[in-house]
Each structure stands twice: as C-alpha cells, then as structure tokens.
Amino acid sequence: MYYGFDIGGTKIALGVFDSTRRLQWEKRVPTPHTSYSAFLDAVCELVAEADQRFGVKGSVGIGIPGMPETEDGTLYAANVPAASGKPLRADLSARLDRDVRLDNDANCFALSEAWDDEFTQYPLVMGLILGTGVGGGLVLNGKPITGQSYITGEFGHMRLPVDALTLMGFDFPLRRCGCGQMGCIENYLSGRGFAWLYQHYYDQSLQAPEIIALWEQGDEQAQAHVERYLNLLAVCLGNILTIVDPDLLVIGGGLSNFTAITTQLAERLPRHLLPVARAPRIERARHGDAGGMRGAAFLHLTD
C-alpha cells in the first residue's frame, strides 16, 4: 500500500492507495503549529492506524509546501512552522523504520496527474497551478524533476515578458511580489491577480468568482476582462512552453474550475510559440483536493 501525506498550514491529510493507484482510505487531522514532537506524533499515529487497518507496512510519501530538504537536511516550510528547520525526512524514517520520501506539494500535484490512467501515455507532463499563487511541476517519464533547490516549476516567479507589456501597455504597473522581485507573473495570473487586473482596469473590487459569474451572464466588461486575462496567460505560457515543450499541460488550482481557461487557451497559444512548435494537450486537473495525497503516495513509484 502507498501512503500519501498532503501537509499544509492547517491540516495533515493522509490517503492510502492500493497497487492499482486507487484511494482506499483517507483521514485528516489538524496540523500542530508549535510543537515538532506533536507534529511527528500526528504523522506517525496516522501511519500506525493505516498499518493496522490494512495489515501491511505501507510506503510513506509526503508533499509539503516549501523546500523539502535543504543542504543540511532540514525542511524549509514557512507555512508549517512546527517542522520548518527540522530534519523531517530523517526523523520520520527513523521513527517509522521505513524510507520516507518528501517533495514539494506542487511537484506532487504534477506527479498525481502524470500517473492518471489517461495521462500515463505522455512522457513529459507539466502541471500548472492557478490558485492563490501560481506554481507547478514537471514530470518526465513518471518521475518529478525537482532541481537542486526544489524550485523547478516555480513558474509564478518568472517576470512578465516584453510581449506582455506590448499587450497590456508599457505603463502597466510592475507589482512587487512576496518573493521580493518586481513583475512576477503570479501577481497577474493567480486568482488574486485575476481580481487585481479587473480592479486595475475598471476600478471595481470584485473576487474572481464574482467576475466569472458576470462573464457567464454576458457582461461586456467581464468578457473584455477575461479576454485580456487569457491573452496575458497565453503570452506568459508561450515563453514557458518554448523552454519546457511538454506533451501535456494539466491546469489545477481554483481558476481551473473556470472552463474558458482550458477550452480557449489552446487557440491562443500558437501565436506565441515557434512556428515549428506543437502546442501541448491542455486538460483540467482530474484529482482536485486529492492530488497532493496521490502525488505524495506515488513518490514510491518513481524508482
């Protein structure tokens, strides 16, 4: 059995998957915020419960935001302060007496989709998350590409390309990102960025679901906004896809529920790619909230 943990600032979610990659059981508990000992106990107790329930010693994979293992073997995860700065992988491997694997949660999302029955035919899969921020991951032949700093797929921290400024106007404001840089594309393409663009052009403060509802009602202002957003997304993806050249692009995060993104993006991409380039197949993520657990569990399928 494959145990996959999706760990965030508020919850520790465990999913147990069988050899056919089907979810058999899941459980969630609150994430301890201050005590590392309590954090380790929470994970180990869930593993013990799963072992007892299924009568096996399952493999353990963990997806967590941040950098799973720094040069000194410790975790960097600002959203999980109880474990940040601690040798999480080594400590859990010792306590559970098994190989524990860690990866960035965005990489786990991409891995989950790459191992979907429908998508395993594609050698190079790019996962793109359009949510609170913009992130993602790359999976080649069923294995995540992490890079030495676990930042492969941090697409949101690429800066706006020149073509974006041509589209939006050269007086378009370069917003400061939480990472400290100016003009990172997640400030414009995330769910919050989607809402910011609307406010910037129309001086109205609406959340993304409200804007999308107006678009669905045929509101001209909302339709113009969505057109602008999709063109900006295509421009930015043109640069990324020219570098990565994936077979499949899977889009997740809150904005993936907006069908116009997956249905209208493909027709806009070719004008931003090399003439010889083939645009990837574009699909909405299949596994929703379970994606993090799935991808973490499947870290043990990558040998």
Curated annotation (Swiss-Prot):
Highest taxon of the lineage: Bacteria
Kinase listed as a keyword: yes
Catalytic activity: N-acetyl-D-glucosamine + ATP = N-acetyl-D-glucosamine 6-phosphate + ADP + H(+)
UniProt GO MF annotations: ATP binding; N-acetylglucosamine kinase activity; zinc ion binding
Pathway participation: Cell wall biogenesis; peptidoglycan recycling
Residues that hold ATP according to the record: 4-11, 133-140
EC number annotated for this UniProt entry: 2.7.1.59
Family: Belongs to the ROK (NagC/XylR) family. NagK subfamily.
UniProt cross-references to NCBIfam families, sorted A to Z: PRK13310.1
Protein function: Catalyzes the phosphorylation of N-acetyl-D-glucosamine (GlcNAc) derived from cell-wall degradation, yielding GlcNAc-6-P.
Name of the featured protein: N-acetyl-D-glucosamine kinase
Lineage: Bacteria, Pseudomonadati, Pseudomonadota, Gammaproteobacteria, Enterobacterales
Name of the gene encoding the protein in the UniProt record: nagK
